[in-house]
Swiss-Prot record:
Family, as annotated: Belongs to the TCP-1 chaperonin family.
Subunit field text: Heterooligomeric complex of about 850 to 900 kDa that forms two stacked rings, 12 to 16 nm in diameter.
PANTHER family: CHAPERONIN
Family matches, as SUPFAM superfamilies: GroEL apical domain-like, GroEL equatorial domain-like, GroEL-intermediate domain like
Gene Ontology molecular function: ATP binding; ATP hydrolysis activity; ATP-dependent protein folding chaperone; unfolded protein binding
Entry GO CC: chaperonin-containing T-complex; cytosol
Organismal lineage: Eukaryota, Metazoa, Ecdysozoa, Arthropoda, Hexapoda
Protein name, as recorded: T-complex protein 1 subunit alpha
NCBIfam families: chap_CCT_alpha, thermosome_alpha, thermosome_beta
């Protein structure tokens, strides 16, 4: 196919042909190479410094790619792919990018051998469908058989590559307890785990092992006045997304007064409106008011007199979660549809206790025994802010993984086990097809081996030797029925040997593997379909400015 770079009638250039596809593949590979060395339990971290000097130290694929300022449109597809994996599954962001880039590289080789991209796309789709089916039918194990230990092992596997890998035993138990404490059952009897109801707070100082799990939702706020009660049992909670301040006339309102007494009457009415508003809230039995804005001295006085607790400057995201957990309404204004102010008992949430407690070195507001759904908090300790930020990302990934496993009830063995098994299966499956798709499926099978190879290289082990052993074990498990137990074989990257990873407790959610295969395949196909790139020239901004035009008298009517 000839390569053209021709000017267009519009202000831009058009590139078409093989060079566009090769450029896209090279861009994808360069993104993959950035995150490649951070894969696995012995992967390395990246230090990213942004344009204002903020430093981030992480080996989370999605975070690394989010902080990069990527310009190439094909590379942006991989960045978005990592974000999608992070939102959908929470873990496996690095491996999904590496796999997509490898699929593209091998597809480009086939295109150079004069195989049409449509045949490759068709083959990739067949391979992805067969791979997902094979995982579901042959490579998954139900969690119920393995019990709580399997959940701890899954969290540990997720954390093994992170900065808290040394304390994975401690944190994995904490994460599993936190996830199980926020379990809710819907009317159909299905369990769901809302990990948004787990608030992760960071406080630097002390060691990582002094992090704590607290029953109840912790807020990094304190009561508005020291005269307010610090503990309220059987709390009735109002969640207000506005400030409670003395009512003043709107800007631009002008009042002409001849008599000074009338000015005093206006001030008195302003005070009365504020008092009526506070009494309307307290009249429904509310004794805890959470406000996203400020609370002025006048309002504070009324709350203190009523023996109620007010907490100001609560983050809006926290306020929404508390409203959901306590059954309260998230109120943005007291004004109803008729333009009148109202507040009734149906807008009030309930909790067993709201108290201000000193946890670690900080005063926090703790909301315990929420009525509608449970809530929990994890307070992370670490030597500095970089460490605490990376701990938070690690705990978030582990929580997501545990949630997925608890909801789907299926796990697979980790350490390159799934990829090696699929590689053998798809190679054999490819030979059963008598069409051009056979070549694409064989390349798909070859691409999957990039995960065990990268794991071995990052662990400073002999990748060729280890992957060859792994493939021979999986080949035996698929061809000899008496050796079917070998299907759980994966890599032990510390010892540099092959072992049964199901027994060793290296487990991952089946959903994570299936979704990453689907996402990587779709991303590769999206880039593979492109054979033309039209780039518009940037707008010329060298014209006259508004000030110049005025000075020249060009804008005069």
């Amino acid at each position: 196919m000839s390569t053209l770079a021709s000017p267009l009638s519009i202000a831009g250039t058009r590139q078409s042909g093989a060079s566009v596809r090769t450029q896209n593949v090279m861009a994808a590979l360069s993104i993959s190479n950035i995150v490649k060395s951070s894969l696995g339990p012995v992967g390395l971290d990246k230090m990213l410094v942004d344009d204002i000097g903020d430093v981030t130290v992480t080996n989370d694929g999605a975070t690394i790619l989010r902080l990069l300022e990527v310009e190439h449109p094909a590379a942006k597809v991989l960045v978005e792919l990592a974000q999608l994996q992070d939102e959908e599954v929470g873990d496996g962001t690095t491996s999904v990018v590496i796999l997509a880039a490898e699929l593209l590289k091998n597809a480009d080789e086939l295109v150079k051998q004069k195989i049409h991209p449509t045949s490759i796309i068709s083959g990739y789709r067949i391979a992805c469908k067969e791979a997902c089916k094979y995982i579901s039918e042959h490579l998954t194990a139900p969690v119920d058989e393995l019990g709580r230990d399997s959940l701890i092992n899954i969290a540990k596997t997720s954390m093994s590559s992170k900065i808290i890998g040394a304390d994975a035993e401690f944190f994995s138990a904490m994460v599993v307890d936190a996830a199980q404490s926020v379990k809710i059952t819907d009317p159909r009897g299905q369990a769901a785990y809302s990990i948004k109801a787990i608030n992760v707070l960071k406080a630097h100082g002390k060691s990582a092992r002094e992090s704590v799990l607290i029953p109840g939702y912790a807020l990094n706020c304190t009561i508005a006045s020291q005269q307010m009660p610090k503990k309220i049992v059987n709390a009735k909670i109002a969640c207000l997304d506005f400030s409670l301040q003395k009512t003043k006339m709107k800007m631009g309102v002008q009042v002409l007064i001849n008599d000074p007494d009338k000015l005093e009457a206006i001030r008195a009415r302003e005070l009365d409106i504020t008092k009526e508003r506070i009494n309307m809230i307290l009249g429904t039995g509310v004794n805890v008011v959470l406000v996203s804005g400020g609370v002025d001295d006048l309002c504070m006085k009324y709350f203190v007199e009523a023996g109620a607790m007010a907490v100001r400057r609560v983050k809006k995201s926290d306020l929404k979660i508390i409203a959901k957990a306590t059954g309260a309404a998230f109120i943005t204004s007291l004004t109803n549809m008729d333009g009148e102010e109202s507040f009734d008992a149906s807008m009030v949430g309930e909790a067993a206790e709201v108290a201000q407690e000193r946890i670690c070195d900080d005063e926090l507001i703790l909301i315990k025994g929420t009525k509608a759904r449970a809530a929990a908090s994890i307070i992370l300790r670490g030597p500095n802010d970089f460490y605490c930020d990376e701990m938070e990302r690690s705990v978030h990934d582990a929580l997501c993984v545990v949630k997925r496993v608890l909801e789907s009830k299926k796990v697979v063995a980790g350490g390159g086990c799934v990829e090696a098994a699929l590689s053998i299966y798809l190679e054999n499956f490819a030979t059963s097809l008598a069409s051009r798709e056979q070549l694409a499926i064989a390349e798909f099978a070859k691409s999957l081996l990039v995960i065990p190879k990268t794991l071995s290289v990052n662990a400073a082990k002999d990748a060729t030797d280890l992957v060859a052993k792994l493939r021979s074990y999986h080949n035996s498990s698929q061809t000899k029925p008496e050796r079917s137990d070998l299907k759980w074989t994966g890599l032990d990257l510390i010892e540099g040997v092959v072992r049964d990873n199901k027994k060793a407790g290296v487990l991952e959610p089946a959903m994570s593997k299936i979704k990453s295969l689907k996402f990587a395949t779709e991303a590769a196909i999206t880039i593979l379909r492109i054979d033309d790139m039209i780039k518009l020239n940037p707008e010329d901004k060298s014209g006259k400015s508004y000030a110049d035009a005025c000075a020249a008298g060009e804008l005069d009517g």
